[in-house]
């Protein structure tokens, strides 16, 4: 079953919060990266090369596979890739330092390109404009991946290449049996595990449209099946939009593998919870039991307001991220007074079957998302949404939901930006959406405390980075604090504080967030 919406909706664009912090001074001049481990007090400093475009890093997560290739395969890759992409395969060292790479890509173009192809090497999707070149590259990569599977019986995760200018390009892979995914990446701040997680998100989107069961049937029936032309135009459009966002405007929820909630007063959130609960109970009494599996209420920018779910089931974060992307991509051009109805397969929930989603924008600028297992449940779900809409209109508490919290800069003048993640609920809070440059700093902080599989090295750890800028006297400091209960990322700009003072500010911030948790997060939602 392929996604083909029956109805359409639209809404006005909502302004997304932005930050006024200017970090460009720290990115344009030659500098060095200082790593400090607060727990141990050790400090390491690496000076950048004389190239003003380079900013040094102290660690490298690249995994080079070229030493395992035989001479013929090396020759094939080098000659063929040079005709497609001006790079040479490094055959001398497998741990070349990331110091020779650009810390932040200043060329203005995308530093990531995503590719999807079948187990037979047939191209499904590419961000390259020249499809012939993309097909040639995927054919080569298909050969390389098969080489490792046959000779080493191991899945290839990544290989690294270096251009004549010393810039590193990584090719990271994810093998999903019938589907192979690859990302060509020119940055050094995302680890292999993080890039593979992005590939898994792309794969989850494909499964959301096709389902694993249907994909298996198609590929087993004909191994060289053309999946590219099986996907609808809408599928291709949404897949392109997702990959473009991953490459140029990555979302904070992807970075933190979490969901973001709308800050609001507990009274307003409880009012919406009560409406969902009473309406659902009314439907059960009316013999509609089992028709409604999940109900989500979000803001127009996909921040969670409330959720209705079974007491023994929760939807995986990645499944919800895919659902939000499908809705987000169609939100701008659709009509407000109509609804969207489409099938969707949640890979992490049940990758063999479809659920059915009804989406509607309500007058108070919230989005209702109702999910059912029944293909013919549209009328029932539509009536369910109508009743909720009527109750929200009658209840003034359900208007003007977002709560404007205090000015964080006044309470914490040294903190320019932060991200707080509550692990139990897999939800995050940030006072404003980080810029791409900020996310790159956060990636560097996170990588210090994770292994090559993306797992935290310790149950509890605190790490600090300081980026020195020779053009100005200040330092840009970053703190990453991870425990079993939370993760905290902080950026502090142009200050010269001691580690103890910075850590004290972090503790005060955590204490304040815990005092207002009921405003920031959904603790449980409505269960049945």
From Swiss-Prot:
User: GO terms for CC?
Assistant: fungal-type vacuole membrane; Mon1-Ccz1 complex; multivesicular body membrane
What are the subcellular locations of this protein? Endosome, Multivesicular body membrane; Prevacuolar compartment membrane; Vacuole membrane
Name the membrane topology term: Peripheral membrane protein
What is an example of a Pfam family matching this protein?
Fuz_longin_1
Which keywords annotate this record?
A: Autophagy, Endosome, Membrane, Protein transport, Transport, Vacuole
Principal localisation: membrane
- What biological function has been recorded for the protein in this entry? In complex with CCZ1, is required for multiple vacuole delivery pathways including the cytoplasm to vacuole transport (Cvt), autophagy, pexophagy and endocytosis. The MON1-CCZ1 complex acts at the fusion of vesicles with the vacuole, through its regulation of the SNARE complex during the coordinated priming and docking stages of fusion, and particularly at the stage of tethering/docking.
What is the name attached to this protein's record? Vacuolar fusion protein MON1
**Species of provenance:** Kluyveromyces lactis (strain ATCC 8585 / CBS 2359 / DSM 70799 / NBRC 1267 / NRRL Y-1140 / WM37)
Q: What is the lineage of its organism?
A: Eukaryota, Fungi, Dikarya, Ascomycota, Saccharomycotina
Gene name linked to the record? MON1
């Amino acid at each position: 079953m392929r996604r083909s919406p029956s109805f359409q909706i639209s809404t006005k664009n909502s302004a997304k919060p932005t930050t006024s912090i200017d970090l460009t001074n720290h990115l344009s001049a030659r500098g060095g990266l200082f790593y400090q481990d607060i727990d141990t007090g050790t400090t390491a400093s690496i000076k950048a090369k004389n190239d003003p475009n380079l900013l040094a890093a102290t660690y490298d997560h690249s995994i080079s596979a070229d030493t395992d290739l035989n001479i013929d395969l090396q020759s094939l890759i080098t000659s063929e890739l040079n005709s497609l992409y001006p790079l040479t395969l490094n055959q001398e060292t497998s741990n070349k330092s990331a110091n020779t790479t650009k810390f932040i890509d200043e060329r203005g173009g995308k530093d990531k390109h995503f590719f999807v192809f079948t187990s037979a090497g047939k191209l499904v999707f590419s961000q390259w404009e020249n499809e012939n070149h993309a097909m040639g590259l995927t054919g080569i990569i298909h050969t390389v991946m098969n080489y490792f599977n046959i000779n080493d019986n191991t899945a290839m995760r990544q290989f690294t290449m270096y251009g004549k200018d010393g810039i590193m390009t990584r090719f990271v892979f994810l093998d999903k049996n019938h589907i192979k995914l690859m990302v060509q990446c020119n940055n050094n701040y995302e680890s292999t595990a993080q890039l593979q997680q992005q590939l898994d998100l792309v794969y989850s989107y494909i499964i959301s449209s096709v389902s694993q069961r249907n994909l298996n049937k198609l590929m087993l029936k004909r191994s060289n099946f053309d999946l590219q032309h099986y996907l609808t135009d809408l599928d291709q459009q949404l897949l392109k939009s997702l990959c473009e966002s991953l490459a140029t405007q990555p979302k904070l929820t992807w970075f933190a593998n979490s969901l973001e909630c709308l800050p609001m007063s507990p009274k307003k959130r409880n009012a919406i919870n009560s409406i969902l609960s009473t309406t659902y109970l009314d439907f059960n009494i009316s013999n509609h039991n089992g028709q409604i599996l999940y109900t989500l209420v979000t803001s127009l920018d996909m921040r969670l307001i409330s959720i209705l779910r079974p007491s023994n089931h929760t939807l995986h974060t990645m499944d919800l991220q895919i659902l939000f992307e499908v809705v987000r991509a169609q939100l701008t051009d659709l009509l407000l007074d109509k609804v969207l109805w489409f099938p969707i397969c949640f890979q992490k929930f049940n990758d063999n079957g479809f659920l059915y989603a009804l989406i509607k924008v309500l007058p108070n600028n919230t989005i209702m998302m109702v999910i059912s297992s029944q293909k013919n449940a549209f009328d029932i779900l539509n009536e369910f949404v109508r009743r909720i809409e009527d109750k929200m209109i009658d209840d003034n508490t359900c208007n003007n939901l977002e709560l404007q919290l205090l000015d964080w800069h006044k309470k914490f003048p040294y903190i320019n930006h932060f991200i707080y993640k509550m692990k139990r609920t897999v939800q995050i809070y940030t006072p404003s959406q980080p810029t791409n440059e900020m996310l790159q700093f956060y990636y560097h902080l996170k990588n210090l405390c994770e292994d090559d599989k993306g797992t935290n090295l310790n149950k509890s750890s605190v790490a600090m980075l300081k980026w020195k800028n020779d053009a100005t006297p200040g330092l840009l400091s970053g703190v990453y604090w991870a425990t079993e209960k939370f993760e905290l990322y902080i950026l502090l700009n142009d200050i010269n504080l001691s580690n103890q003072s910075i850590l004290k500010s972090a503790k005060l911030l955590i204490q304040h967030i815990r005092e207002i948790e009921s405003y920031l997060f959904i603790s449980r939602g409505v269960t049945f």
